[in-house]
């Protein structure tokens, strides 16, 4: 998320960062503003409908309109079906899937006022293929994939586009403590990709930037797979 925010700011976008991690969010906000960008941070728990409405209101109050939304909050868990508690299932679904729904719902009225917009939902390669683990995670990201398509169909006539992004294994704060936490696991993860490496946040950010831009104006309801060939096998 921080990489995307900085890249958007460099391209001239006015950026609103929403996160429960206030220290990290404020740090990114300061870095963008200190380098000539325009950015504000708002505290946002993506499972809270009121906080989504507040975040959208803050964006419009500060910058005049809202025409891009990137839903990229998420948690990653690797439990198999019998290892997954009901509480864990609900937590993963609430953050990864419900959060996307609430953000989209809150943003659409302002995008309508703006004359259109682009919604980019970060899904996963595990929304496209099955997994020997990550039961709740894969299900949540599959929900994001199909919710994106429904959003695209419902709002295309109003100039509001919606597309999903499907990363492979990316080196982020979410994966570093889990599937990339040892050198052996890093090598194994790299070897799973035909391109022979782990993805970097910039690999995803460039795709998100494209989907937010007018260059992708004929894309909606699509899946942008950025996974080093992982799901092509």
Give the role of each language-model region:
Residues 80-81, 85-90, 185, 189:
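Substrate-binding pocket helix/loop in short-chain dehydrogenase/reductase
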Residues 109, 153-157, 217:
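Alpha-helical segment proximal to the catalytic Tyr-Lys
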Residues 129, 208-209, 220-233:
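Short C-terminal tail/terminal secondary-structure segment
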Residues 104, 140, 148:
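Active-site helix of classical SDR
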Residues 79-82, 129-135, 157-158, 196, ...:
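Active-site loop immediately N-terminal to the catalytic Tyr-X3-Lys motif
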Residues 1-16:
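Canonical Rossmann dinucleotide-binding motif of NAD(H)/NADP(H)-dependent dehydrogenases/reductases
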Residues 124:
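Residue(s) in the substrate-gating loop at a strand-loop-helix junction
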